[in-house]
Amino acid sequence: MPAFHATRKRSAWRWLRTLAWSLLYPACVSVVSAEESPQAILAFDNPVQQYGSIARTRLEGWRSLIDAARELTDLEKLQRVNEFFNQVTFVNDIDHWGVEDYWATPTQLLTSNGGDCEDFSIAKYFTLRQMGIPADHLRLTYVKALKLNQAHMVLTYFKTPGVDPLVLDNLVNGIEKASNRDDLLPVYSFNAEGLWLARERGNEQHIGKPERLSRWQEVVARINTEQMP
């Protein structure tokens, strides 16, 4: 992946690699089990009943967004999806779900009208896949948000392999090239087909399949039990 920031410091890379390995290995990952899940998570069999008619309206808007895809270019799809989901309220997992880290499905994000950066990125990824954009053009990308000094997730879009990708970020309404986002330092990225670790000189290392990410597998399993629009 092209570099997000040309000047990477050694100390930053030590921090990032520590973060990356803690996120990649299941032994270091806190996964929500049925026994540990808050009632809010377990009660999602009928989200519209739980959250009311406004939730249904948001889901209908999602359906309309996907239905319009055949008339749109890829860039128009990116712009509309980014704008649509960025209307949702940002809420930390501990406040929203009662757990430290939870990856919500797009349905959960929309019906509850709240989520964090992972939830926004996941929803955009699966929506764009439904709109016909191939998996190898999209990656969920963990970065360090330098201004916030914290881990953050964005969705990146590659028109062709190896080019400077576009960044879809819940903190920024506009879509910019990664090379223009010098506030973001990439750690690793993944999609349904692979997992890549960012390298110091702006390249990347393919390190396996996304099955290594237990939280990803868990959210995909839940999405498969839901009915996408």
Residue ranges and their predicted role:
Residues 2-5, 31-229:
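A structural boundary/capping signal
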Residues 5-20:
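Bacterial N-terminal signal peptides that target proteins for export
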Residues 24-32:
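Hydrophobic h-region of N-terminal signal peptides that target proteins for export
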